[in-house]
């Protein structure tokens, strides 16, 4: 029998296969919430933390401060699919990486505030997001301007 608190958790993105449709369904209930907050909500999908949030949303070219309701189910599914792919690539341990370039940064945006974007050259920014004030790294040119919140 499952503990009642475990029943509230979203699908495990490292399950084989992960239930991405359930993650999208749970994300939909957060219509006005910022996608950067929603992807880290463990009752939506389990496993996405700060690094994977910033890296996934960058690779999917989504504004982390946009409302989840502004995105199609297909785009949301793409976010969860990308996150699970990045997490699977890093199952073998540290150092964790989402970008593979000799002698370069292991990340596209995470921890790179003030540095140039590898894709377009714009300056990577960091803003606090959500009630917990978690850091969110993003490229304002590749991902669109941040919205208030």
Task: List PLM regions with ranges.
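Short metal-binding segments enriched for Cys and/or His
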Residues: 143-149
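A broadly conserved sequence feature marking short terminus-proximal activation segments
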Residues: 57-111
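Short functional micro-motifs and their immediate structural scaffolds
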Residues: 53, 124-126, 147
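Phosphate/anion-contacting hairpin/loop surfaces
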Residues: 1-48, 52-61, 67
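Short metal-coordination and nucleic-acid-contact micro-motifs, chiefly zinc-binding Cys/His arrays
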Residues: 41, 110-114, 135
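Short linker/helix segments within small regulatory modules
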Residues: 128-135
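Low-complexity, intrinsically disordered Gly/Pro/Thr-rich segments
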Residues: 118-128
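Short cysteine-rich clusters marking metal-coordination/redox-active sites
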Residues: 117-120, 139-142
């Amino acid at each position: 029998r499952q503990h009642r608190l475990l029943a509230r958790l979203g699908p495990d993105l490292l399950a084989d296969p992960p239930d991405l449709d359930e993650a999208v369904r749970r994300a939909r209930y957060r219509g006005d919430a910022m996608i950067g907050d929603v992807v880290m909500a463990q009752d939506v999908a389990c496993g996405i933390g700060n690094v994977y949030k910033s890296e996934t949303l960058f690779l999917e070219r989504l504004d982390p401060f946009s409302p989840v309701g502004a995105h199609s189910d297909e785009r949301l599914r793409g976010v969860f699919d990308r996150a699970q792919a990045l997490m699977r690539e890093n199952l073998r341990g540290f150092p964790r990486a989402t970008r593979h370039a000799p002698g370069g940064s292991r990340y596209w945006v995470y921890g790179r505030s003030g540095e140039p974007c590898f894709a377009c050259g714009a300056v990577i920014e960091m803003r606090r997001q959500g009630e917990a004030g978690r850091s969110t790294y993003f490229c304002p040119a590749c991902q669109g301007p941040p919205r208030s919140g």
